[in-house]
Amino acid sequence: VRFLLSGYYGFGNLGDEMLLEVIVGKLRERYPGAVIDVLSQTPEETARDFQVEATPRMDLSAVKHAIERADIVLSGGGGLLQNATSLKSLLYYAGIVRTAIHAGRKTMIFAQSIGPLDFIGRQTVRECCKGLQAATVRDERSRSLLETLLGDVTVERSADPVFLIDQPARVVVGGLGPEIDPLVVVCVRKTAAFADGTDKIAAGVDRLAELGANVVFLPIGGAADAEASTAIIRRCRSTPMLLPVDCTATAVGLIARAKLVIGVRLHALILAIRFGVPFLAIPYDPKVSALCEDIGYPLPALWTPGARSGSEGDPAEAARAAWERREGLATLVGEAAMRMRVSAERNFEVLDRLAKV
């Protein structure tokens, strides 16, 4: 069987590279001898790093050829079908689905979050996904939206495949040893309202430092995340560190070792849950809020971008409460991790059914 994977691959975003790592590993486990082709921004690197075939994602002739050669086309995982990023991005990913369906390939929306979508976005998804054979989504909001748009497609709830990532060996970065514990990891990204939140995030970081935590910023989205991290560090009275992160093992290992994670990045929060680490979310996107709802997480956000003035709590107080409750929260998060791992396997169970058709 020959698979083609369409996602945000080859851009150096470690969250998406983790996603690809898990999907490729599970496909090899379930389909020995399968050929895996990945649409990538940097196909040579993707082919080398994951031992797969890779096709340049913006070479439309090559993409069309890759679709025609595939037996099964997987759109995902990730938040691909949304036009908060841009309509161009949505048209690209929806166009892959449309082309695959028209070419008679078995086509599946795989482990995605759907939306936000405006009117044009909804029409685009509705038209491009007619004839889709299978779909799994990461949260209830996405399931409801996609079922409304597609009607005749059974949309199944799952969870992000990164919940299935393996426990890493203990990671030491730049000579950091046990003296860095207790560790708090912060993963931020620039958002539309980011400038409004730098002081708020800094206040939370400073309170954690006062309580004895060692805070490190981990830019898993690359240079843009490092820039966002630096902007917050400059607003801090304490002295958090900015750590370079050049591979998924480093990111996974540090988050698994942390006592608390502060996350804008969805995959930072997913990794925290996977390894039973309490967290404070910064819900810049509905998919972050949906994840917290799905696990019944009891803590409010550290800061909510775009919230009405006066409707937010005190970030420093939120940080203090999370730190003092961290042991009890770790138990709750660990139990949620077991449920989410079962849900994440559902992506591959639905794929198995499609492969047998």
Model features per residue range: what roles?
Residues 1-357:
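Active-site anion-handling motifs in enzyme catalytic cores
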